[in-house]
Amino acid sequence: MKVAKWYNNHDIRIEDVPKTQPGRNEILVKIISCGICGSDIVEWYRLPRAPLIPGHEIGDVVLETGESVSDYKPGDRVFVAPKVPCLNCYYCTKGNHPVCSEVADRLPGGFAEYVLVPDSIVTNGTYLLPDSITYDQSTFIEPLACVVRAQKLAGIREGQTVLIIGCGMSGLLHVKLAKSKNCKLITTDINPRKLVYADRFGSDITVDAGENVPEILLARNGRKADVVILCA
């Protein structure tokens, strides 16, 4: 099968690798869509593990199942989590699952024709997609989950003023989610084009990051923000 293997940000190669057959508790999925996360292009984070196949925001369909898999069948449209926390380590017991110190299985990268899903992720990290969600839309499930968790930790509530610094994909998801909670949204970025999108997504006030943001915030909102979310 074909994969896009990352060696560094200036060296990505299309290579052939064997297509692995699923074990008794595993499934093989065919990748239909795969998003590009900001972390996929952060070299200092990726280089120690290079070369690697990136991509953890995927929409896929089940191609083959192991003989002991009963919850999924070929043809099922699924979302597969990139990793599953152990639920038992110090961090997991404190609710900090993203920094689990005992993660054993990670999803192989989605920049490939097929991905073999290990048994732990089949059991605890694979979800059927409703017909209303397209494969492209399903690539937003993982980043949206990060946004939901962040706003839960921040305790964002209706009526609060929320300042979002950075209007890339994550920042715009924060805008949509906070707007659904009837919050007042102020967004800032160094890129004017991103501020246009923030405005379209529902930001009440957009400010160029090169300006005096605190001063503008006080002048236009009458007070400082209740919550600041950093996405830059």
Where are the regions a protein language model picked out?
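Glycine-rich beta-strand-centered segment in the early N-terminal region that forms part
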Residues: 20-34, 45-90, 130-132
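Mid-domain Rossmann-like dinucleotide-binding core that forms the NAD(H)/NADP(H) cofactor-binding site
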Residues: 134-211
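NAD(P)H dinucleotide-binding glycine-rich loop of Rossmann-like/cofactor-binding domains
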Residues: 86-165
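Short, well-ordered coil/turn residues at beta-beta hairpins
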Residues: 33, 81, 209, 231-232
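Short Gly/Pro-enriched turn/cap motifs at secondary-structure boundaries
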Residues: 7, 18-19, 50-55, 103-109, ...
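Short SAM/SAH-binding signature in class I
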Residues: 225-229
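Short amphipathic alpha-helix with an adjacent loop that forms part of the alpha/beta core around
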Residues: 212-223
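Cytochrome P450 core scaffold surrounding the K-helix E-X-X-R motif
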Residues: 39-43
